[in-house]
């Protein structure tokens, strides 16, 4: 059983994969500017900057490390969305400059050293994990911070939730929040290999989402695009996470 304690201070959720990528390349960049690079231990530098990040965020948001949680991805070939889109995320190209061993190091050595709270569940991506918990606690807390650079999280934006990247930039500002999931389902997501609906462009989608929801569905039906849209929205909208997986995660979490 994993405890999530509700406090007066903000609760911070990290998309674990995003953070590791960010810190990995930020550490490499930092090392490149040092004079004696040969005598710098990468993992020691990574850990030192990781701790600095935690301290900086605690100070920025007036919270404590005990209020920080990391959402962890399941294995890509076990993601529940694969059942609905066989090519989901299949076209992602590995960065040859990135050493994936840092994931295991973070989830074991760094986790134990800093007593990190990593949350994962079979078949769920990190954003699924965070979305499910977010829904459970959003009416019980004063402030939630989500740290990511993934626009999928934009749908979690509300008056109590701030969604930022590690540069502390609000990633929701560049998006139209009105009917956001509908918009994203219409235009697709190349990074996840989700194709757009028909030949709808971003400009067309911007116009469509101004309509009342019932008119949007009527328009899609009239143009024989409703099936494509439904296929996309099922993958994109967190409300379509299978109930069984939601229950699996929540059965192992105690919100106190």
Where are these regions (language model features)?
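Extended two-metal-dependent nuclease catalytic cores across DNA- and RNA-processing enzymes
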Residues: 1-4, 37, 64, 90-255
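Domain-level signal for Mg2+-assisted phosphodiester chemistry and nucleotide/NA-binding surfaces
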Residues: 1-108
């Amino acid at each position: 059983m994993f405890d999530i304690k509700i406090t007066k201070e903000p609760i911070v959720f990290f998309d674990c994969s995003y953070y590791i990528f960010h810190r990995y390349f930020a550490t490499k960049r930092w090392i490149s500017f040092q004079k004696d690079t040969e005598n710098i231990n990468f993992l020691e530098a990574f850990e030192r900057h990781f701790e600095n990040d935690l301290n900086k965020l605690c100070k920025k948001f007036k919270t404590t490390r005990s209020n920080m949680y990391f959402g962890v991805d399941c294995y890509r070939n076990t993601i529940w969305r694969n059942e609905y889109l066989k090519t989901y995320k299949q076209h992602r190209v590995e960065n040859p400059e990135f050493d994936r061993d840092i994931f295991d190091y973070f989830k074991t050595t760094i986790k134990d050293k800093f007593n990190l709270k990593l949350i994962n569940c079979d078949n769920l991506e990190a954003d699924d994990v965070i979305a499910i918990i977010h829904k459970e606690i959003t009416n019980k807390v004063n402030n939630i911070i989500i740290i990511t650079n993934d626009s999928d999280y934009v749908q979690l934006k509300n008056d109590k939730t701030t969604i930022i990247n590690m540069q502390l930039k609000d990633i929701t500002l560049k998006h139209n929040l009105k009917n956001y999931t509908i918009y994203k389902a219409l235009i697709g997501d190349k990074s996840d290999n989700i194709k757009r609906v028909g030949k709808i462009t971003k400009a067309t989608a911007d116009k469509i989402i101004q309509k009342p929801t019932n008119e949007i569905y009527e328009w899609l039906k009239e143009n024989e695009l409703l099936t494509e849209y439904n296929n996309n929205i099922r993958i994109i909208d967190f409300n379509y996470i299978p109930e069984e997986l939601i229950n699996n995660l929540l059965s192992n979490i105690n919100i106190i």
